[in-house]
Amino acid sequence: PAEIPQEDFFAGVRLSRDRLFRGSYAMCDAPLGHIQTDKPNTAYDYDAIIRGENGSENEGGDTIQIQYGTGVKTVKLSAADGSYIPHKPVISHEVGQYDYFPDFDEMKMYTGPLVPRYLDIFRERLEEKGLYTQWRDFFEAVGAHCTQCYKDEIETALRSSELSGFQLLDLQDFNGQGVSLVGVLNAFMQSKGFITPEDWRGFCDSNVLLAKTEKYVFGAEEKPSVEILLSSYGKGKIKSGAVQYSLRSDELDINGSVESTRS
């Protein structure tokens, strides 16, 4: 990594080959991120990675492939100190490398000079495989999965106290060169129907309540251990003190308060 003196912050995706502070990567930018490779959880964060506590060294001389424009480029690895620690705020770049399935109903929305040729290509490929009649099922399944991945990725960033912020790859689909259907909104800034603005702000807002646990699924005999965190990027400072909580379900109604342990 190179820190430029006039920069106010460091924006990137890794501090060495294995010190990754983004949750997902294209194969040309391997190794892949924790959301692609690890067991689903809400405990992972980037703090040790940014502080250099689990750093590794590149010996130099080897070559790797990296994303370059819409293709790949082979570059030579230089020697890098795995203990490198940034001296400026760290921003995670292009978070959200999740490709939604194309919505073919969107084709009729192109009424001007721009023609969605990429949708024609995708349709032709599905027709060749005899799968076009199932595209709506694929769209719904992939969309639900991608939206959950977005949630996991953003919550990981918010759990990381050493990470100062993140830049989304895009909130909407990009239908220009290469085509990236990575948005929860389509190219016309319209919802794809997988999440409401209110639910999105539940994990992407100035103040977000987070539950930190090692896994999503617990056995009947297991006792879950959950740490509750509050991520606050708002203008005002959150005062420490007693925090009131309420847990409700069809069979549960628990209310109480607990003293906060850190600010």
Residue map of PLM features:
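Generic structural signal for residues positioned in beta-strands
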Residues: 91-92, 208-210, 244
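Short beta-strand segments of immunoglobulin-like
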Residues: 213-218
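Intrinsically disordered, low-complexity coil segments
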Residues: 174-184, 191-195, 251-256
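Proline/serine/threonine-rich low-complexity linkers at boundaries of modular beta-sandwich domains
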Residues: 189, 193-208
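Intrinsically disordered/low-complexity terminal segments and short unstructured peptides
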Residues: 41, 195, 259-260
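Generic beta-strand/beta-sheet core signal
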Residues: 93, 169-172, 203, 231, ...
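Substrate-binding/catalytic cleft of secreted carbohydrate-active enzymes
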Residues: 1-185
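Beta-strand-rich binding/interaction modules
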Residues: 221-263
